[in-house]
Amino acid sequence: MSINAEEISTLIKQQIENFDSDIEVSDVGTVIEVGDGIARAHGLDNAMAGELLEFSNGVMGLAQNLEESNVGIVILGPYTEIKEGDEVRRTGRIMQVPVGEELLGRVVNPLGQPIDGKGPIETSKTRPIEAAAPGVMDRKSVDEPLQTGIKAIDALVPIGRGQRELIIGDRQTGKTTVAVDTILNQKDQDMICIYVAIGQKESTVRNTVETFRKHGALENTIVVTAGASDPAPLLYLSPYAGVAMGEEFMYNGKHVLVIYDDLSKQAVAYRELSLLLRRPPGREAFPGDVFYLHSRLLERAAKLSDAKGGGSLTALPFVETQAGDIAAYIPTNVISITDGQIFLQSDLFFSGVRPAINPGLSVSRVGGSAQIKAMKKVAGTLRLDLASFRELEAFSQFGSDLDKSTQAKLNRGQRTVEVLKQGLHKPMVVEKQVAIIYSLTRGFLDDIPVEDIQRFEEELNIWLESNRNELLTSIRETGNLPDESEFNDAIDSFKKTFLPSNN
C-alpha cells in the first residue's frame, strides 16, 4: 500500500485546524487542618472573602479568614469525610440562594434546599445572600400600616411597612406566638411572609408550619429553618438566606414581612464559628464584629421609593433575654439598630396578661405615622393611661382609702388590661379593634364587670356585623372614625341588649 504524501498533509492540516488549545486554570489548595466544622487550607492565595470553595468530596465551604499563609473555611455540610491533604478548589462564586414565587408554601434550609418532602423547587432565579442595603435616596418614609391583628401592638406600638421592630423577652413569654399571629393576619393583606426559624427544635417548627397550613397562611409564606441539631454555619447563614428571598419580592414592588426567630441563637452560632477560627473574643466572648453581623442584616429592611417600585421589607427580629436583662450585649445592640421594641414580660405572662406586652418599655419610633387615623384617635392616651394605672396599682396595695378619681382610674385601667388580652391564634381585623378600644376610651365599659369584658367584646363584634356593618366598613375603607354620635348610638343600642353575668 503506497503512502500518499498529499493525503498525509491534508490529514495533518485538519488535525491542526481542529486542535483545541483551551487550558482550564483552577486555583487549588490543600487542607492542612480540619475539625469542628472548620478547615484551614494552604495555597488559595487569590480566594475572596465569602467565596464558595469546593472540597474534593463535593461539600461546599465558605472562605472566612484570609490569612497570610492559609485560608480559614467554614464547612457547609458534613465535615467528618474531609481529611488533611484533601484538595479544595475555588469556584469564583459567592453564596447564593434560590428565590421567586416557587418557594411560597415551602419549607427550606438556609441553602434553599427543600426539606418538606414535596419534591424539588423549580426555580432558576438566585440571589446572593450578602447584598448592600438600599441607599438613602432609594427609600421613603414608613407611611403604610402593617396590621398584626394583635390589639396591644396595633394600638400601643404600631408597626409600619418597611420598619424594623424588635420583639424581646425571656424564653416562654409568647414571642413566637406574636410572630405566628402576625403571619396569620397577613392572609388577605397582600403580604408575603418569610419565617426564619433559627436553632429551634424540629418539632416546634413542624407545629408552626402546621398552624400556618391549618389557617390557610402557608401559601403566602416561606419557612426557612436551621434546626438546633444543624451545624453552626447554617444557623449563622439562615437570616441572610431569608432576607435574600424577601428582597426578590421587595424589588419587584411587593410587600414582605421577614421574622427572625431568634437572633440570639444566630449570635451564639457566630460566636462559635469565630472562636473556632481563632478570632479575638470581646465582651461576653462575642467577636468584635457581632454588631455588624446584625446591622448589615436589619439595614436591608426598607420602604422603597416609588422610583424603585414602592415595595417594602418589614423585619421583626426576636432576641431572647436572660431574666429580663435588656441591658445585655446582644439586646442593647439590636435595640440600637431597630426602630423600636416590644418587650414581653414573664411576670405579666404568668399572671394571665397575654400577649404579655410591657407598654412602659415598648416603643415604636416610626410606626405612629403609619397608624390609621381612627386607631390613632381612639388609642392616643391608652399608653399613658396604662402606665399611670400600673403606678397607681402598686400604690393602692398599701392603702384602701382611695379618692374617687383614683378609684375611677384603677377601674378604667383594669378594663384596659382586660381589653388588650387576646386568645391564641385569634388575630382581629383593625375595624373591630377600633370599635372595642373606642368603647373603652369613651367610658362605655366603665360599668361592665371586669370578668364580662371579653364576652362584651365578642358580642359587640357580632352585633355590629349584623346590625351596623356600615360603621365597620367605613373604618376599614377610609381609615377614619365614623360620625361619633352614630358610633355612640350603635354602642349604646348594643349595651342595652347586653346582660352582665352578675344579673
Curated annotation (Swiss-Prot):
InterPro entries: ATP_synth_asu-like_sf, ATP_synth_asu_C, ATP_synth_asu_C_sf, ATP_synth_F1_a_nt-bd_dom, ATP_synth_F1_asu, ATPase_a/bsu_AS, ATPase_F1/V1/A1_a/bsu_N, ATPase_F1/V1/A1_a/bsu_N_sf. ATP binds at residues 169-176. One of its GO terms (cellular component) is plasma membrane. The record marks 362 as: Required for activity. Its EC number is 7.1.2.2. It comes from the Bacteria. It catalyses: ATP + H2O + 4 H(+)(in) = ADP + phosphate + 5 H(+)(out). One of its GO terms (molecular function) is ADP binding. Its main location: membrane. It is a peripheral membrane protein. It is found in: Cell membrane. SUPFAM superfamilies: C-terminal domain of alpha and beta subunits of F1 ATP synthase (SSF47917), N-terminal domain of alpha and beta subunits of F1 ATP synthase (SSF50615), P-loop containing nucleoside triphosphate hydrolases (SSF52540). Belongs to the ATPase alpha/beta chains family. HAMAP family: ATP_synth_alpha_bact. This is ATP synthase subunit alpha. The gene is atpA.
